Amino acid sequence: MALPRLLSAVAAVAACAVLAGAPALADEIQEINLQFRTGDLGGALDHANRYLAQHPKDARARFLKGLILADQGKTNDAIELFTGLTEDHPELPEPYNNLAVLYASQTRYEAARNALETAVRTHPNYATGHENLGDVYAKMAAIAYGKALALDSGNAAVQTKLTLIQNMLGEQARKQAAGKPVPGASPPAPAR
C-alpha cells in the first residue's frame, strides 16, 4: 500500500510561507530547509534545534523539524512535534496531514482518519488532505473486506471488492516506487 505522503521538501518551503513569521528569520529557515532537501538530516536537525532554542514557538521551524524527524525514522518524536503544532495552530491542515501519514505508517488508520478529517474540516479546499483521506479509507476498506472474506471465503462479491482495492493500492505503491510524481503536494493559501 502506498501510504499518504508527507509534504515534500519542495512543498516544505511553501509550507513555511503558509506558516508565516518574521521575514528576517526566513533566511535561517531556508538554510535549514536547504540542509534537509540536500539530505543533511543531522545538520538540519542540529540547526533547527539551535534555532528553536531561540525561537521555540516558530511554527515554520517546528514544522520543518517534524519533517526532518520523520525522514530520520523518529516517528514518535515527529508525532509529538506535529501534535504540538496542531494544538498551537489548529487552523493549519499540514500538521494534521503529516500526523495522519505517520499514524498510517504505524497502521493506526483510525487515528490517521481522525487527523485527516480535522485537516479537511479546518481547510475544505486542502486537496492533499482529501486525497490522503481517500487513501486511508481505501486501506481501511481493504482490511474490512479481508476480515469479511476470512469469515465467508465463498463470498465472490467481497473477493471482487477486495481485489479492486488491492489493485488500486498496489498501483499507487508501484508508481511511488518507480519515482513517478504524486500529484497535489502544495499547501493551501493561508485561511483568512
Predicted regions and their residues:
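Register position in tetratricopeptide repeats
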Residues: 37-38, 71-72, 105-106, 139, ...
